[in-house]
Amino acid sequence: MFIQPCFIRKNTPELREKLRKIGYRSMNRSDKEDEGECLLVCEGDEDLIDSYPFYAPRDNKCCNYYDQSQVIDCGTNEELFLALASLRDDTDVNQWFTNGNTWKNCMLHKADLDSWNREFGFGTTVVHKATVKELVEHFKDV
């Protein structure tokens, strides 16, 4: 399941395609996807039978009302947005791992942390899945 709702203050066909590739579906009809300056991503409502992770176009004014402690405003930073939107608790695919200095994006269902510790010389500092706070800090100036 996706675990971090967030939004970005841009809405392009290329960005929507990247969201589809990581598992999100549009909440809007395809002819309405270009409407709105922001894209919001959320996990669907688990109480609904036909619920799914979705992205939805929004206007900037609407995005200003989200609770920043719950939904992260990525500004126009696409790398941060995609890193946060990819956070899941059921797979390591597209997840960022770090030891605080070295960063690696995982393309495997389950990260091989022992191998990464040896291969990248992470040494005594153990590599781990990056936290939301670490991702925000790492991608803030990208």
Regions found by a protein language model. Give the residues of each.
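Short, extreme N-terminal segment that most often corresponds to the first beta-strand
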Residues: 1-27
